[in-house]
Every structure is written in C-alpha cells, then in structure tokens.
C-alpha cells in the first residue's frame, strides 16, 4: 500500500497522506539491518508470534506490535521545502510535543535519531525518500510489551534501553489517546490541514488501480 500511495503522491494524483496504525508482532530490518541483530531462532520467533521482514527504510532492526503507534507519513518534500534531515527533525519535534501533552519530557538533541526520555528510547524513526516523497516513518511506544525488544539489538545499539509512555507515567495510555494528541501537532509542525478518513476509504481507491512501473 505504501508504494502505491507514494507513486500517486509523487504523480500529483493523491494529496500527502498519513497512515496511523498498530502492527501485529513483527521485527523489521532496514537497509543496514543484519540477521544477527535478531537474537532468537525461528522456533522462538514462532512462540512469540512474531514475523521478520526486510524492508527498504533506513536503519537497522526494530520491533512493531500492539500498543505501539506506527506512523507512515507519505509526503512530497519537493512541495513543502526542506530535505530528509529537516523532515526527520520535524518528526522528532512532533513526537516530543505529543509526549509533552502527557507530561513526558523527551528530547532528541545530541542523541542518535529518535526520541529519548533520559537514556531510554521511546520512539524510533526510519524513513526512505524516493522521487522526493517519503515512506516509512516512526514508531512511538505507547503501551507495548517491551520484552519483545529483549530479543533484538534494537537500532544497532546493544545497550540501548527502551521505554513507553505507560511505563514513564505509571498508568495505561491508549494508542487512540496518543493519536488524538499527535494529530494537531503533526498538522502544526508540517503546516497541514488534516482531514481524517477511514482505512477502507484509502483501500478502496487502490483496489483496481494498476501500480505504475
């Protein structure tokens, strides 16, 4: 779906699009990811109910799963100005502003890419830009099962600790609550007027549309 939307955004057939979702348990390896960064065998992965996918974003290996807000902004940077670095920094600021709504003090300066609470990573970012249009995006730990990170060398950093909004606050936070806080900040940071559509509306426009070569 991402690839098809990216083609349509690049061709001016679709407006910039933001996909927000939760994944089932999955480990994804970016272009710099290594199979050795996954520390368990296939039998253990099956017990965990987790799949492994090699994808074309930047970065190494990370985990996605229930309780995590994953966002795929598919944006034409050529229309909005700024390159990939500015885009990533704007994503970081958007996530930091979102976390501040809940009283979580986060930062990104002088750190590896992503968003951090002290020495603990709370959000990961991995993107790709093709024909000036972004794909992939970010993953914000709202209230996932953080033990899934124990089975990988997350983001290529063996000693990195992960955290979540719920762990930092000491109570449950829902992904829906995180989305409600994130959307206004995303619109403000990127200068968008946002309109929400149901997933079926996005899918129905893609069903019979041939993918451009």
What residue ranges belong to the model's regions?
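N-terminal lobe of the biotin/lipoate ligase/transferase fold
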Residues: 1-116, 121-122, 147, 172-173, ...
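Short, charged/polar low-complexity linear motifs in solvent-exposed/disordered segments
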Residues: 45-46, 88-90, 141-142, 167, ...
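Catalytic-loop motifs flanking and including active-site residues across diverse enzymes
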Residues: 67, 134, 178
């Amino acid at each position: 779906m991402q690839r098809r939307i990216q083609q349509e955004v690049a061709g001016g057939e679709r407006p910039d699009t933001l996909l927000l979702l939760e994944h089932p348990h999955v480990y994804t390896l970016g272009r710099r990811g290594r199979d050795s960064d996954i520390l368990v065998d296939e039998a253990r992965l099956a017990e965990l109910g987790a799949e492994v996918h090699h994808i074309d974003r930047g970065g190494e290996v990370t985990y996605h799963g229930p309780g995590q807000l994953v966002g795929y902004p598919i944006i034409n940077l050529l229309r909005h100005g700024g390159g990939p670095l500015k885009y990533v920094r704007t994503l970081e600021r958007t996530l930091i502003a979102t976390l501040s709504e809940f009283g979580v003090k986060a930062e990104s300066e002088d750190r590896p890419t992503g968003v951090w609470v002290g020495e603990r990573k709370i959000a990961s970012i991995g993107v790709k830009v093709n024909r000036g249009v972004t794909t992939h995006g970010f993953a914000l730990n709202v209230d996932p099962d953080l033990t899934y990170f124990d089975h990988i060398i997350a983001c290529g950093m063996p000693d990195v600790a992960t955290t979540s909004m719920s762990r930092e606050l000491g109570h449950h936070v829902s992904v829906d609550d995180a989305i409600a806080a994130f959307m206004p900040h995303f619109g403000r940071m990127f200068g968008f007027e946002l309109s929400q559509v149901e997933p079926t509306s996005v899918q129905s426009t893609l069903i019979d549309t041939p993918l451009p070569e």
